[in-house]
Curated annotation (Swiss-Prot):
InterPro entries: Ribosomal_uL5 (IPR002132), Ribosomal_uL5_bac-type (IPR020930), Ribosomal_uL5_C (IPR031309), Ribosomal_uL5_CS (IPR020929), Ribosomal_uL5_dom_sf (IPR022803), Ribosomal_uL5_N (IPR031310). This is Large ribosomal subunit protein uL5. Keywords: Ribonucleoprotein, Ribosomal protein, RNA-binding, rRNA-binding, tRNA-binding. It comes from the Bacteria. NCBIfam families: PRK00010.1. Signal peptide: none annotated.
Length: 180
């Protein structure tokens, strides 16, 4: 089964982008390269069980086992030593990436309270978009009753676009609900 977003990209989005930006080669047309989900768990310093719960939630959200991130430097004020586990991240590519993007746009973002669209100022200047999610409860896989702590996560959408304008157009074509 081919993902509906993959079909939409090849049949509608790529030709529309080529027409709008007038690329010399079809290989120049921007596409989504990967999506990185990152969950920083600062309270894992005092209680390692919190990190295990975050890893479990990230596994449910992404459908893939996360990589546990470690502290690069020791910071005495935070009681943090180099090499301590302080977060988890997942890199999604291919079908899983498109499945997650579809779920994010059509299911999860509409579940955010008082949702009026996502900020269009979160592009990094190189065609990548970063979205901060305040609570993991917006994802349908997370059972509200089993969550003992509300955690946020970062979603970074990495594209092959050279400019923010191209990346914004690409994500808008995919259906990202940018605030007006």
């Amino acid at each position: 089964m081919v993902n509906s977003l993959v079909e939409k990209y090849s049949n509608e989005i790529a030709p529309a982008m080529n027409k709008k930006f007038n690329y010399d080669s079809v290989m120049e047309i921007p596409k989504i390269d990967k999506i990185v989900l990152n969950m920083g768990v600062g309270d894992a310093v005092s209680n390692a069980k919190n990190l295990d719960e975050a890893v479990e939630e990230l596994t449910l959200i992404s459908g893939q086992k996360p990589l546990i991130t470690k502290a690069k430097k020791s910071i005495a004020n935070f009681r943090l030593r180099e090499g301590m586990s302080i977060g988890a991240k997942v890199t999604l590519r291919g079908d899983r990436m498109y499945d997650f993007l579809y779920k994010l746009i059509n299911v999860s973002l509409p579940r955010v309270r008082d949702f009026r669209g996502i900020s269009s100022r979160s592009f990094d200047g190189r065609g990548n978009y970063t979205l901060g999610i305040k609570e993991q409860l917006i994802f349908p896989e997370i059972d509200y009753d089993k969550v003992n702590r509300v955690r946020g996560l970062d979603v970074v959408i990495v594209t092959t676009a050279n400019t923010d304008e191209e990346a914004r157009e690409l994500l808008t074509e995919f259906g990202m609900p940018f605030a007006k």
